[in-house]
């Protein structure tokens, strides 16, 4: 893991899905970013169904729409707070995509909610926070 300096936080990765815990994670990350002058990358993952059916296709579309809405809301909050932010939408397994993106951007901190939406709307599930924290060498803040 590369860092911008000993204990410095310059770039924060925040996983979002629109759940109450995710919104709290966004707000906490924005407060941290504002205090230390860091930028934020918001990621939302549209989880794809493994079973190719008409119902699964509708669920995939709904999952992607929720992911886009969560990213839009997060960006609005960042703009209101005056924090530089970018958004990225990925498709696939949430934990794997979050860890993969973290490896690409090398954040100083990853922030995510302890639990997320479930079912077709589940871009980030509760087990995702555990999987991310176990699968990466970056600092992880899990918000309840």
Where are these regions (language model features)?
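Short glycine/serine/threonine/alanine-rich loop segments
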Residues: 38-39, 83, 107, 138
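Gly/Ser-rich helix-loop-strand patches that form or flank binding pockets
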Residues: 1-4, 100-144
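Structural beta-alpha unit
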Residues: 1-7, 76-110
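Amphipathic, non-transmembrane alpha-helical secondary structure
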Residues: 23-30, 34, 72, 95, ...
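Small/aliphatic-rich secondary-structure junction motif
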Residues: 5-55
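A short acidic, glycine-rich active-site loop
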Residues: 58-69
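Conserved beta-strand positions in the Rossmann-like core of class I SAM-dependent methyltransferases
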Residues: 41, 86, 141
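Generic structural signal for helix capping and beta-alpha/helix-loop junctions
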Residues: 49-50, 95, 119
């Amino acid at each position: 893991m590369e860092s911008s300096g000993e204990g410095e936080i310059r770039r924060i990765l925040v996983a979002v899905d629109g759940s109450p815990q995710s919104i709290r994670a966004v707000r906490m990350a924005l407060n941290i970013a504002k205090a230390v002058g860091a930028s934020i990358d918001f990621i939302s993952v549209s989880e794809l169904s493994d079973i190719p059916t008409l119902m699964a296709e509708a669920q995939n579309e709904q999952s992607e729409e929720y992911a886009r809405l969560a990213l839009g809301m997060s960006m609005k909050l960042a703009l209101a707070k005056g924090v530089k932010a970018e958004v990225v939408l990925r498709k696939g397994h949430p934990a794997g995509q979050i860890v993969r993106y973290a490896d690409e951007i090398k954040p100083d901190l990853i922030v995510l909610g302890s639990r997320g939406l479930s079912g077709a709307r589940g871009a980030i599930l509760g087990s995702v926070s555990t999987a991310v924290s176990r699968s990466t060498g970056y600092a992880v803040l899990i918000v309840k």
